Amino acid sequence: MNIKSLIRTIPDYPKPGIQFRDITTLLKDASGLRQVVDALVERYAGAKVDKVVGIESRGFIVGAAVAYELGVGFVPVRKKGKLPGDVLGHDYALEYGTDRVEIHSDAISPDEHVLLLDDLIATGGTAEAAAILIEKLGGHVLECAFIIGLPDLGGERKLRVLGYKTFSLCQFEDSE
């Protein structure tokens, strides 16, 4: 089964000119969801992974399942103000302005090896911010993994230039 065929494209959402890649059609398909989780688990089963970090919100869905299968803990990275208690935050640039993601300050221990997971990478700003938070807590980013890569937007390339390894299960070009 090709997981790419289970991902719906919604044109002009959330604004004109955007091709929104909707994974809810993939997630509702039991075989498709299993294929995604199994592929990621297979990739990292032999690696030293201490934690899986998932980025809000769709990164939580697959990230928690992968963490469970790997037998490691799951850590959420959330938008500003969504985590209770002591948090560490990092601001990152948007097309117009900035946004912020946060992680609990005790979520990662020094020298832990962390798999960073999200549903999609576009420009890479959110993934970069999450990786920086992991490193500020003393963790090491093993790899930044995504269900979908959008190579035309340069996010994976940006992360690789910054020294992070990246992996996407499938990729969509702008024309698709």
Swiss-Prot record:
> Can you name one GO molecular function term for this protein?
adenine phosphoribosyltransferase activity
Instruction: Name the InterPro entries on file.
Output: Ade_phspho_trans (IPR005764), Adenine_PRTase (IPR050120), PRibTrfase_dom (IPR000836), PRTase-like (IPR029057)
Extract the PROSITE patterns matched here.
Answer: PUR_PYR_PR_TRANSFER (PS00103)
Keyword Lipid biosynthesis annotated: no
Tell me where it resides: Cytoplasm
Q: Which UniProt keywords apply?
A: Cytoplasm, Glycosyltransferase, Purine salvage, Transferase
Task: State if Transferase is listed as a keyword.
Answer: yes
The protein's matches in CDD domains, at most eight in alphabetical order, are given as:
PRTases_typeI
**What NCBIfam families does this protein's entry cite?**
apt, PRK02304.1-3, PRK02304.1-5
In the record, the note on similarity to other proteins reads: Belongs to the purine/pyrimidine phosphoribosyltransferase family.
On subunit structure and binding partners, the annotation says: Homodimer.
Would you tell me the protein name for this molecule? Adenine phosphoribosyltransferase
Q: What organism does the record attribute this protein to? A: Methylobacillus flagellatus (strain ATCC 51484 / DSM 6875 / VKM B-1610 / KT)
